């Protein structure tokens, strides 16, 4: 089989993967999935790096052909990986990296406008910072639920959806505000370079960790809408 969009597989010694180990049932089509720890450096595994518009290679396609995984590399319950995976995703989807991946362009903008920004810049930056604080509180709230032993699948999906859409839009908002930055700003060149990089990398943000469409389906089910 083939797995697409595997982060850092080209430099990894091991990866975690879910494979079908028995047929699904009529009652549960997700039954029969098992999670394994897979050794990457072995025959039957081919990693194809995927180039990005930024020139980086971060994601990969992994092709499996007649490779072997020993029994002691099973993670968790045999045939019960779906529940494990959805629980694990609550950790992945609610963390601060889901709204801070392009945050550096905002900090560079703050440096560029200096201590006495014009009214438009001050209002724009203030609005963005308020949104960051709101998302941080949401992320911390989900962390508290996880610490209490709960499974905030819907709540984590909301954080990821709101956060990645926001950080995808952030470089464009900063670009609009950067138009008012003085040409003499000491970090003007740095800001422009970081903006260029952030705009190129932003499209991936609503795909990695679960696409926006998948997340909204999870949220809809949690609310009883589907």
Where are these regions (language model features)?
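Glycine-rich phosphate/pyrophosphate-binding beta-alpha loops
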Residues: 4-9, 53-54, 204-209
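Glycine-rich beta->alpha junctions and the first turn(s) of the following alpha-helix
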Residues: 45-137, 205
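C-terminal helix-coil-helix/basic helical segment that borders enzyme active sites and/or dimer interfaces
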Residues: 119-122, 133-190
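Short, well-ordered loop/turn and helix-capping segments at boundaries between secondary-structure elements
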Residues: 20-24, 39, 43, 65, ...
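A short core secondary-structure module
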Residues: 2-46
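Glycine-rich phosphate/cofactor-binding loops in nucleotide/flavin-utilizing enzymes
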Residues: 84-91, 95-99, 178-226
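Tryptophan-centric aromatic hotspots in well-structured domains and transmembrane helices
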Residues: 5, 14-16, 35, 59-63, ...
């Amino acid at each position: 089989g083939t797995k697409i969009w595997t982060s850092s597989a080209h430099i990894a010694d091991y990866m975690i993967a879910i494979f079908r180990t028995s047929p699904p049932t009529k009652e549960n089509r997700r039954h029969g999935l098992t999670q394994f720890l897979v050794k990457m450096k072995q025959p039957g595994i081919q990693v194809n790096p995927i180039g990005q518009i930024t020139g980086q290679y971060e994601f990969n396609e992994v092709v499996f052909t007649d490779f072997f995984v020993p029994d002691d590399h099973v993670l968790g319950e045999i045939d019960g990986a779906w529940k494990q995976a959805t629980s694990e995703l609550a950790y992945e989807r609610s963390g601060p990296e889901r709204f801070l991946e392009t945050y550096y362009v905002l900090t560079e903008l703050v440096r560029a406008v200096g201590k006495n920004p014009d009214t438009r810049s001050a209002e724009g930056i203030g609005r963005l910072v308020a949104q960051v604080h709101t998302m941080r509180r949401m992320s911390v709230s989900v962390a508290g639920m996880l610490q209490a032993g709960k499974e905030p699948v819907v709540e984590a999906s909301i954080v990821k959806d709101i956060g990645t859409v926001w950080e995808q839009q952030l470089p464009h908002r900063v670009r609009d505000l950067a138009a008012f930055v003085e040409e003499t700003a000491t970090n003007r060149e740095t800001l422009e370079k970081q903006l260029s990089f952030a705009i190129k990398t932003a499209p991936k943000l609503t795909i990695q960790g679960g696409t926006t469409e998948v997340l909204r389906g999870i949220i809809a089910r949690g609310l009883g809408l589907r």
